[in-house]
């Protein structure tokens, strides 16, 4: 599963949110990126096609209704899927051991 840099940035917004979000809320959250609404619309549809984002309902937005979205997988699940695609299955136990060792040597936050 490959996400573009922009798609990853959109997903970071969703992973950090504690609620489903409409496109307009995503647009207002990324004011520094200066994405156009149409670009975000395309990215949201692409993220749904890739299975990392799902439509969960509708919310009133002005005189119309807007779809709301939430992650279809957690950030950790996404990273696991990316690693699983890149790493041969026989090396996964070694990766898990390295992660456990890293956790043991990293101070808790």
What kind of region is each of these model predictions?
Residues 3-6, 58-80:
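Short, cationic-aromatic polyanion-contact patches
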Residues 48-60:
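A short, conserved structural fragment
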Residues 5, 21-22, 39:
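Alpha-helix N-cap and coil->helix boundary residues
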Residues 34-49:
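Short amphipathic alpha-helical interaction segments
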Residues 20-29:
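Short acidic, hydrophobic short linear motifs in intrinsically disordered regions
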Residues 1-13, 17, 74, 85-89:
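Short alpha-helical segments that sit at the start of domains
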Residues 76-109:
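Amphipathic alpha-helical dimerization/coiled-coil segments
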């Amino acid at each position: 599963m490959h996400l573009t840099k922009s798609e990853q940035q959109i997903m970071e917004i969703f992973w950090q949110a504690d609620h489903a979000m409409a496109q307009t809320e995503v647009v207002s959250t990324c004011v520094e990126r200066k994405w156009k609404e149409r670009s975000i619309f395309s990215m949201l549809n692409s993220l749904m096609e890739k299975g990392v984002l799902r439509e969960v309902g509708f919310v009133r937005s002005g005189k119309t209704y807007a779809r709301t979205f939430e992650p279809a997988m957690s950030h950790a699940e996404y990273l696991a899927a990316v690693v699983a695609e890149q790493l041969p299955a026989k090396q996964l136990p070694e990766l898990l051991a390295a992660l456990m060792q890293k956790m043991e040597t990293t101070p808790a936050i």
